[in-house]
From Swiss-Prot:
A matching Pfam family: zf-C4
GO biological process terms, semicolon-separated: cell differentiation; hormone-mediated signaling pathway; negative regulation of transcription by RNA polymerase II; positive regulation of transcription by RNA polymerase II
Main localization of the protein described in the UniProt heading: nucleus
Keyword Transcription regulation among UniProt keywords: yes
One cellular-component annotation, GO: nucleus
Zinc finger (NR C4-type): 47-67, 84-108
Entry superkingdom: Eukaryota
Region of interest: Disordered: 411-434, 467-516, 562-604, 666-690
Organism: Choristoneura fumiferana (Spruce budworm moth)
Cellular compartment(s): Nucleus
Domain (NR LBD) ranges: 154-401
Record's protein name: Ecdysone-inducible protein E75
Family: Belongs to the nuclear hormone receptor family. NR1 subfamily.
Length: 690
């Protein structure tokens, strides 16, 4: 295998961010030089995004051609990919890198790909030297991996190393637990009730830090045991973290399963004390978890596992290939198979009469994972409730102190506090009366939580020094329920009267205060919205008369001045109904509208809309062509008048009769109604015709 890295490849600056998937090679550190993040497969540089064969240094990281082109298209076209539907935690590998483009782009950005990291030119010699040194170190790591793989193939050696690792890191072996159990039965020392986790015997007042420190050395033992398993150091940092995070509680529970004493129905705690099953608190409703844990512990203890079997079973629980997020699944599967074969060998030696014991032991893994999930959920609930309880206690202390301080000022104003008075909204308390202050403060917190009845909100009588103290609280304001028959719009005719229903003979401060507030409340008309007022107001104009005025003929505007004058002289005179135009004067005139009932008379619409009337009375605006035709007609009319005057003068002078003018020789006027020339006709001036 050769290194795919040409001298003319484009290289850029190296980011100092830690690798996402963890390299198998420790980077070469030099002063004032960026850290080199490269993954090798022998002598081949791998892509930082998908693990494929890298083609060079692109956009700041070593990547393949596929990831380089994908990142270039994404940033140049500004593509917005659809969000991931798997919690944005998809594993980007060579075989599935095209399934989730959202997580692939996220991985590209996480490993350090950037448009600004592009640099053109050859690879510097110093960079080449660093890469070659990393390759050599990768070769040595490869040799170490081959040695570890050979160790995995050696079953007796693998078995011995796993058992030795378990005995060195576990404090609760079979012999030690037997001694602790005998000592606890002879001299039982019962611890105080603890939380849902049955292996913590600390008192209730311990902090979370003490709770964590009690299990710190036990958890550290499980982590050290995992590091001593052959082949575990060959995994990447991410794979190590994934295996430990998923199987830590499972392995810890398998180690501590011998601490449960089923006959005595108790637990041997880490400090050697006994704790009864019934004394375990179920603060997080963990009764089901406790019962399931005891049942599973009884099932496991009935198998009487040896230390070698427990060590190998813990290794199998930790090295499981079906954990989500693993990258080197092949190596994990190989380790799991080797450990399982070693456990089969040990069981065959110790339990030759039980051939199905291995299957029976492996069937407990689903129940173990279920208990781990329940424990994690209840632990989260416990932490949330514990923090909430501390917060409530702090708030309770803060509420009591200001309550007593405010009582000093109130007592100065009223020496007797609030004895049968409604002067203040809440009952004050004096510093010298702690019982009264504490009682009222407790009532105040109950009222704020809304857990008291309607009767408890009434008068509270407290006997103190022979006086009846009656704290009066301001009544809460309730929203008025809407009636099913209420449309939401009032008619304005309702009488705002308070209906007094049948009530009790005695009155409470709350009822008197509500009556006082209702008396001071303004009328509903003042609070009525604008929409209700508009709907309740009478119409500004009669709809029928408005339609009549709108549809009157245009002819009425010819006599607008006369109508206006009559309207000014008689503003309340009824307007006659317009008569329709008839083609024959002798035809009977029928009214355009049927006879209406007499209604209030108003001024004509033309007097109120003067602008509209003037615009309608104005003559129509003529186009330039129409104006030109009008001028020509007027010129001909002037010529005819002038010629008639001349002929009349000549006739008077000669004493002759008027001559009929023959228009055959005279110029013919233009016929403006037709485009073709009109035939010759006799022309008579308008004045002669008249």
């Amino acid at each position: 295998m050769t290194l795919v890295m040409s001298p003319d490849s484009s290289y850029g600056r190296y980011d100092a961010q830690p690798p996402v998937d963890g390299g198998m090679v420790n980077p070469v550190h030099r002063e004032r030089e960026p850290e080199l993040h490269i993954e090798f497969d022998g002598t081949t540089v791998l892509c930082r995004v998908c693990g494929d064969k890298a083609s060079g240094f692109h956009y700041g990281v070593h990547s393949c051609e596929g990831c380089k082109g994908f990142f270039r298209r994404s940033i140049q076209q500004k593509i917005q990919y659809r969000p991931c539907t798997k919690n944005q935690q998809c594993s980007i590998l060579r075989i599935n890198r095209n399934r989730c483009q959202y997580c692939r782009l996220k991985k590209c950005i996480a490993v350090g790909m950037s448009r600004d990291a592009v640099r053109f030119g050859r690879v510097p010699k110093r960079e080449k030297a660093r890469i070659l040194a990393a390759m050599q170190q990768s070769s040595s790591s490869r040799a170490h991996e081959q040695a570890a793989a050979a160790e995995l193939d050696d079953a007796p050696r693998l078995l011995a190393r796993v058992v030795r690792a378990h005995l060195d890191t576990c404090e609760f072996t079979r012999d030690r637990v037997a001694a602790m159990r005998a000592r606890a039965r002879d001299c039982p020392t019962y611890s105080q009730p603890t939380l849902a986790c049955p292996l913590n015997p600390a008192p209730e007042l311990q902090s979370e830090k003490e709770f964590s420190q009690r299990f710190a050395h036990v958890i550290r033992g499980v982590i050290d045991f995992a590091g001593l398993i052959p082949g575990f150091q060959l995994l990447t940092q991410d794979d190590k973290f994934t295996l430990l995070k998923s199987g830590l509680f499972d392995a810890l529970f398998v180690r501590l399963i011998c601490m449960f004493d089923a006959p005595l129905n108790s637990i041997i705690c880490l400090n050697g004390q006994l704790m009864k099953r019934d004394s375990i608190q179920s603060g997080a409703n963990a009764r089901f978890l406790v019962d399931s844990t005891f049942k599973f512990a009884e099932r496991m203890n009935s198998m009487n596992l040896t230390d070698a079997e427990i060590g190998l079973f813990c290794a199998i629980v930790l090295i499981t290939p079906d954990r989500p997020g693993l990258r080197n699944i092949e190596l994990v599967e190989r380790m799991h198979a080797r450990l399982k074969s070693c456990l089969q060998t040990v069981i065959a030696q110790n339990r030759a009469d039980r051939p199905g014991f291995l299957r029976e032991l492996m069937d407990t893994l689903p129940d173990l994972r279920t208990l781990s999930t329940l424990h994690t959920e209840k632990l989260v609930v416990f932490r949330t409730e514990h923090k909430e309880l501390l917060r409530q206690q702090m708030w309770g202390d803060e509420e009591v102190c200001p309550w007593a301080d405010s009582g000093v000022d109130d007592s100065a104003r009223s020496p007797l506090g609030s004895v049968s008075s409604s002067e203040s909204g809440e009952a004050p308390s004096d510093c010298g009366t702690p019982l009264l202050a504490a009682t009222l403060a407790g009532r105040r917190r109950l009222d704020s939580r809304g857990s008291v009845d309607e009767e408890a909100l009434g008068v509270a009588h407290l006997a103190h020094n022979g006086l009846t103290v009656t704290p009066v609280r301001p009544p809460p304001r309730y929203r008025k329920l809407d009636s099913p028959t209420d449309s939401g719009i009032e008619s304005g005719n309702e009488k705002h009267e308070r209906i007094v229903g049948p009530g009790s003979g005695c009155s409470s401060p709350r009822s008197s205060l509500e009556e006082h507030m209702e008396d001071r409340r303004p009328l509903a008309a003042d609070d009525m919205p604008v929409l209700k007022r508009v709907l309740q107001a009478p119409p500004l104009y009669d709809a029928s008369s408005l339609m009549d005025e709108a549809y009157k003929p245009h002819k009425k505007f010819r006599a607008m001045r006369r109508d206006t004058g009559e309207a000014e002289a008689r503003p309340m005179r009824p307007t006659p109904s317009p008569q329709p135009m008839h083609p024959h004067p002798g035809s009977p005139a029928h009214p355009a509208h049927p006879a209406h009932s007499p209604r209030p008379l108003r001024a004509p619409l033309s007097s109120t809309h003067s602008v509209l009337a003037k615009s309608l009375m104005e003559g129509p605006r003529m186009t330039p062509e129409q104006l030109k035709r009008t001028d020509i007609i007027q010129q001909y009319m002037r010529r005819g008048e002038a010629g008639e005057e001349c002929r009349a003068g000549l006739l008077l002078y000669r004493g002759a009769s008027p001559l009929q003018v023959d228009v055959a020789d005279a110029p013919q006027p233009l016929n403006l109604s037709k485009k073709s020339p009109s035939p010759p006709r006799s022309f008579m001036p308008p004045m002669l015709e008249a």
